[in-house]
Amino acid sequence: RLSLVGSEMCIRDRFKDYDYIVAPSASCAAYVKVYYPKILEGKHECISSKKIMDVVEFLHDVLKVDHVPGKFPHVVSVHNSCHGVRELGLSSPSERHIKPFNKIIDLLNMVEGITIHEPERKDECCGFGGMFSIEEPAVSTRMGEDKIKRHMATGAEYVTGPDSSCLMHMAGIAKKEKMPIKFIHVVQILAAGL
């Protein structure tokens, strides 16, 4: 059995020589960035939490990408995940009265041929929430169904976002319910045509 302290030390040692740790999932990046320091408080400094970031955050804030060579001639609806919005700052949360921004949309706007929409209640949870979906499967599924319907109401062919867990949750529900919409990670769109 590996303790959390031992686990973190493995991660710290593995990534100590890197400037950044880039994660393809906002919820995973948020866990290491926000929760590792709290879990490990008083045991040792969590070096990984200072280096990790979501791929959208890395492309937008560090690399400052200003051109994407790919093409994606489809209509998409952007899924703003809870962790991405509220813990990583990938977009402005609706409950705060600040100037609206969305790093996901900033990047997608560089893709040739794409049409971008956001659903009504754009930053409301899809119902996954990790253990929540296991402990409250009926509520989780209903929240996912409602979120998918709002994405579909935009006329989108695809739902996209930076959080793999949200996309997998909604894709599973859509498949089971035979809902005519597809799911694709934002990086797949940014890399389309490469």
Located regions from the model:
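Local cysteine-cluster metal-coordination motifs and their immediate loop/turn environment
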Residues: 23-31, 79-90, 121-136, 157-172
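Anionic-ligand binding region
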Residues: 88-114
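Short, flexible loop segments at boundaries between secondary-structure elements
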Residues: 46-67, 177-194
